[in-house]
Amino acid sequence: MTTSDTRDVEATVAEVRLPLVISPRVSFFRRVNLSFAHRLFLTDRIARASPPSTPTRQVIKCADAGAEMVRITVQGMQEAKACVEIKKTLLERGYTTPLIADIHFAPKVAMTVAECFDKIRVNPGNFADGRKKFEDILYETDEEYEAEILEIEKIFTPLVLKCKERGVAMRIGTNHGSLSARTLSRFGDTPAGMVESAFEFARICRKHDYHNFVFSMKASNPLVMVQAYRLLAHEMYKLGWDYPLHLGVTEAGEGEDGRMKSSIGIGALLLDGLGDTIRVSLTEASHLEMEPCTRLRDLGMKACADAIGVDKFDEVGRDFKSFERRESDLPMQKEDDPIDMRNILHRDGSVLSAVTPAQLASEDPFYRDLGAKLAVGMPLRDIATSDSIFLREIPAADDEKANRSIRRLQEIGVGVVAPVAALAATPIDNAVAAVPAKEAKGDMAMPKGAVRWAVVFDGTESAEEIKSALELEPVMALIETAPETSRLHASRRVFTELNKLGSKTPVIHHMVFPADEVKDAVVIQSGAQAGGLLCDGLGDGVMIEQPGAELEYLRRTSFGLLQGSRMRNTKTEYVSCPSCGRTLFDLQEVTAAISERTGHLPGVAIAVMGCIVNGPGEMADADFGYVGGAPGKIDLYVGKEVVKRGIDNETACDELIQLIKDNGRWVDKEVEEEAVAA
């Protein structure tokens, strides 16, 4: 820490201590399995947290950006002793934002910072067990297992008693990638193991009548994270416990992808009434996390009102303890079909793009925006080409360019979907006619030229209306919920009725945003509202529509939503940590450089981690790892195994690429063939 961070050493405990008081709150959702929620700080709000990498200046920046608490990495005793002075400096400048000390491997450091911090975060996977060695340990008897828990109690109890005495709060924060060898031996690398790891520490707290703590269950995989929190809430409910939850998707990455993964995981839980504090973990400057945090917080705070508008129902077909995607049938080819209809949806998740006649008429730019490759001016499907297009307005019969685009897309298997009324007025050959479910009848006539039906649900249909709509044997259903209605709960209601009827109709989540909605809001809302359903296996694709928005951006966001929900991989997956006091290189710069050179490898996951303290454990899902090993030096991993140590920063990216090649996962970037004039 710099001199400016550690000046004026005379803070007293009274000056620096701001005890956090927990105020439980009754749940507002009666229809979900997880039936309680809580709020922190005597206010009915969801608090936002952010961790800076250099204390005083960045704490101020985070507080000014709206952070309601700030987490600081405390690596050792030197930093711990400086924290008293940092706190005093902040108070002198009028900043009373609570500070959280992030502790790993260091019980003595935790004891010291309890003197001046308002909250201590401990990781059950490494607080008493030391650094992960990824060794398989077999416990022959229960006594051996219990002996380790008794040793943990011996190490952890002094901190519990000190926090209780001083009114300091605690976060028991489990991470999917850093479970102890003991936990792994009995529960495996599972959400159940994450919950039990936290409960071991919680039982010690409760034994000493200390209840001023919160839980977190973080993972870089949103599906694992959501399942772990739901399981935690379920187990607490059975025990009669009501402790707050801190939500976060760890190592989410940067930019749109980081925001998308965070909104899928955090948003899914907030919309179910779970969560009290949140943190969006981005590989960006800490204060930039506040805007997506605020958007998620606001979604969570209005979730109650939106959910009240959904009719009550008894949900069936969704098990939060395990993941199983709802079974659906892709379109089948008929003998008399003039074009191939089998690819208008994708088995791993479909993307539909809403387009206009003007976009169709632009031809080559339109094909590129749709994700198609070009060969001599003709579109070809690529790995991230939209599977179907949706036309609210159909081009005029004399619009030669627009109609030519439709024909060319159909020739490469891209579907064309349009409202039944529009097709009745202006037919399109081989189109899919979309009809509102409330108007659908099994004997209704198909518009001229159309060859398949789609039905559109708004979430307010009766069971009879849903049954009647399915008599059309639609190839897909679109769910476009009514405004100010919870998409999550209205869609669950539709899926419940579909399950009762045994329907395997593919379902597309259709989200429509106002023209003036900013990009960040589109990402956050689509991730929370549709991602929460996809994480439960409810849905077969997405369509994000926004008048006037860039088609390429909406398509890219849609594919990002599918990849973040662990459905369809169309690009390289990155697991990258945010900067903290332990970071040994410029994370933002290095992550950008690696992304630039490796972003064309779908199915490959690369972790970029700032240090070896947490890095190897938190990158559990990655195929390759780039980890700070020492100042100026990088360690490279394949899976969880370090294969190269002490590589210079300057050559480490080249070495990483060579490692990917050596393991048979590299492909060269494709060079698009330019159109040739006739």
Residue ranges and their predicted role:
Residues 138-152, 156, 182-342, 430, ...:
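Catalytic alpha/beta core domains of metabolic enzymes, predominantly
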